[in-house]
Curated annotation (Swiss-Prot):
GO aspect biological process, one term: rRNA processing
Subunit structure: Component of the small ribosomal subunit, ribosomal RNA processing complex (SSU RRP complex).
Source species taxonomy: Eukaryota, Fungi, Dikarya, Ascomycota, Taphrinomycotina
The protein's name in its UniProt record: Pre-rRNA-processing protein pno1
Protein family per UniProt: Belongs to the PNO1 family.
Pfam families: KH_PNO1_2nd (PF22891)
Subcellular location, principal: cytoplasm
One example GO MF annotation: RNA binding
Stored PANTHER family: RIBONUCLEASE Y (PTHR12826), RNA-BINDING PROTEIN PNO1 (PTHR12826:SF13)
Species this protein is from: Schizosaccharomyces pombe (strain 972 / ATCC 24843) (Fission yeast)
InterPro entries per UniProt: KH-I_PNO1_first, KH_dom, KH_dom_type_1_sf, KH_PNO1_2nd
């Protein structure tokens, strides 16, 4: 293997190739467009100091995200707007506006934005509200890093139509929302029933506990049995902690 600093000249004369290797040069300077540094004869690279994230952002165009809002959530959005935008502006230091024409919330980085993940956190917060979560529950996504949203449909568990689908949704909700509240309290999650879609907000382990309970109800398990399994799973999770 040739040394990285060797200069190689190849000339073709007839059928023979004459290769001349010049080893008199001890160091090669690379152009700024390449690696912006030098490499000595021993192969040890010498690079310029890496730019900090602040230096990279300086002069760069601010990033922007647009979160679509379903039509049925536009009125609730207007009602809670004075409560929704302060965490985005004061905590994440983002620029935010409600675009009623495109039915969306637009987020953009500002010069004061320091957290590189602020834009993504803001999107998760607004998306959680758009999915149907209460504003006080969605704001937990800004305060805690280990919270997620898991979404699935009833047909992903079992193919149901008509009255069978309605009964499955009724089993998950329970009379007056009793079953849903019991699952939320036992698993420390928040659940939104949006027609045949189910959204669960919580930690990874807690989401799994709540999802197992919801799946059991969809498959037809009696609520009493689901409650017992839910209590056992919650107790085991508490022991691990």
């Amino acid at each position: 293997m040739l040394a990285p600093t060797a200069a190689v000249n190849v000339t073709n004369e007839g059928e023979n190739d004459n290769v001349m290797i010049d080893t008199t040069r001890g160091e090669i300077e690379f152009s700024d467009s390449a690696v912006n540094g030098t490499m000595d004869i021993e192969g040890a690279p010498k690079f310029a100091p890496a730019k900090t994230s602040a230096e990279k952002k300086r002069g760069a165009k601010p990033q922007m995200r647009r979160v679509p809002i379903p039509p049925h959530r536009m009125t609730p959005l207007r009602n809670v707007w004075p409560k929704l935008y302060p965490p985005l502006v004061e905590h994440l230091l983002l620029q935010v506006r409600m675009n009623t024409k495109s039915r969306s919330v637009e987020l953009r980085e500002s010069k004061a934005t320091k957290d590189p993940g602020a834009l993504q956190k803001g999107m998760d917060f607004v998306q959680a509200f758009a999915l149907g979560f209460d504003i006080d529950d969605a704001i937990a996504l800004l305060r805690l890093d280990d919270l997620y949203i898991d979404t699935f449909e009833i047909k992903d568990v079992k193919t149901l139509q008509g009255d069978h689908l309605s009964r499955a949704i009724g089993r998950i909700a329970g009379q007056g929302g009793k079953t849903k509240f019991a699952i939320e309290n036992a698993s420390r999650t928040r659940i939104v029933l949006a027609d045949s879609k189910i959204h669960i907000l919580g930690g990874f382990t807690n989401i799994r506990i709540a999802k197992d309970a919801v799946v059991s109800l969809i498959l037809g398990s009696p609520p009493g049995k689901v409650y017992a399994n839910l209590r056992n799973a919650a107790a085991r999770a508490k022991e691990r902690i």
